[in-house]
Each structure stands twice: as C-alpha cells, then as structure tokens.
Amino acid sequence: MLVIGVTGQTGAGKGTVCKMLEKYGLYHIDADKVAHSVYKKGSDVLSALSEAFGEDILNTDGTANRAKIAEKASAENTEKLNSIVHPAVTQKIKAIIKEQSSLGTKGVLLDAIALFESGENRFCDFTFAVIAPEEMRLERIMVRDGIKKEAALRRIRAQKDESFYKNHADIIIKNYPPYNLDDEVKKVLLWAKL
C-alpha cells in the first residue's frame, strides 16, 4: 500500500489538497485529529502536558484546553510539546496504516504538520509539502480558527520556514496565484501513478 506524506505550514492548504486526493481512493490520516485523540481526559499525554506546561492547560472538567495548549506551544516550547505528544500520535498512526493496509486501501495520505520533525516521514513512500505566502496563510488561519492576528502569527512563527519544506519534501505544491491548484496536485498523482 502506498503511503504519501503531506506537510507544510499552517494555513497553506494541506487539508484542501488532501480532499482533492481522496477522490482517487486515498485514505486521509489527519495527524492533528489523531493528536487530539491522545489528549483524552486522564490520559498519560494530558498528564505529562499538564506537568510540563502547567495546570491551566486543563479546563475545569479536566479536559484539554486546546487553545491554551496552542498558546503555550510558542517557538521555544514546541520541542517540549512535540516530545510528549509525538510518540503517542506515531503509535496511533502506525495502527491506522496497518488497518488500512489490511482493508486493501489503495493508499493513505499521512497529513502531518511535523512530518519530518516527528520522524513519521519514514513510513512514507514519498512526501509533498504545500506552501503559500505568509500573508495568505495568516488570513486563512484567522478566518478558519476565528483567532486574532497576534495568535495566528504566534502559530506561524512556531513552525519551520518555507525553506525547510523545500529542502525536505520530494514535491512542493504551490497553493497561491498564479499557480493552479489542480495542476499542482497532478504532480502528486504522477508520483503516485494514480
């Protein structure tokens, strides 16, 4: 079974590209959603995060306050957050890939913002990164997540810059004018032989 790694900065359009590729029989694994599943109340991950970042990352009912966790995951704390969350996420992703393979799925899209940093790229046959200018990503994040400019900028600054993705990914998908996203996605289809 084909495993395609998908990465890029927040707001670049990874989800949009994955939706386009799902039409070709690929199963989409969203690492963010998998990560949210490891934040369950009472989980080892949530306990470790609370210890590392403080009790205020918990809501009064003991569930994860994702907005507070995102706020604490500034550039200097991203490594600490990732060292706690990534091992649990990787374990779940491996299980999903195994399950999809046993079901005879044509391939999976492993959509992970930290694909290379987490080492999850080692499960992939090839990788691609979606990129877009910071101004476009900033607008998209503010609209998508309903947050203010400062919060969106903190998220952007906590991530790798565009050159990181250009140096690590096999394919670069440009999700901004004058590039046509359908044409850009065809690059992935050619690599995948779909």
List the predicted regions and their residue ranges:
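ATP-binding Walker
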Residues: 12
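Post-Walker A helix-loop "phosphate-sensing" segment adjacent to the P-loop in P-loop NTPases
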Residues: 23-31, 43-44
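Hydrophobic anchor at the beta1->P-loop junction of P-loop NTPases
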Residues: 6
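Walker A/P-loop
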Residues: 15
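ATP-dependent small-molecule kinase phosphotransfer cores
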Residues: 36-105
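P-loop (Walker A) phosphate-binding loop of NTP-binding proteins
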Residues: 9
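NTP-dependent small-molecule kinase module
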Residues: 95-107, 121-130, 134-147, 161-194
